[in-house]
Amino acid sequence: MPLLKPDGSVRVCGDYKVTIDHVLEVSEHPMPTDDDTYHPVTGGEKVTKLDLSSAYQQVLLEEESRQYLTINTHLGLFRYTHLPFGVASSPAIFQKIVDSIMNGLQAVGGISDDIHIIGSNDETHFCNLEGALERMRSMGVS
């Protein structure tokens, strides 16, 4: 089903509750609490919020998983090649990636597709921001 995003673009979302969600082995990865998300980024004078572009769609699906994620449209059947929005495992899979991006970085916190970076001054802030951006580049996330 098409969903209108806040920026006016359209997100295609399958309703997987009636197809694969009930037989899916759901990935287990804890979602962060508010304290986990915001504690690392409290007290900074300078703040950057990165909103990852089409977050889930940056994750390539394994070939053998693609057959289970076919959607039926008025134009025919289409098979996802990247992690779709709406599958029960998608949030945990993507949060695990976000957590690995932030692991070991100072003054960085994030949940889902939002990553926050702080610094006490411009120099510290830009150093923290560059560290986060470099980690994202090395992991192929934008």
Regions found by a protein language model. Name each.
Residues M1-S142:
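Retroelement reverse transcriptase polymerase core
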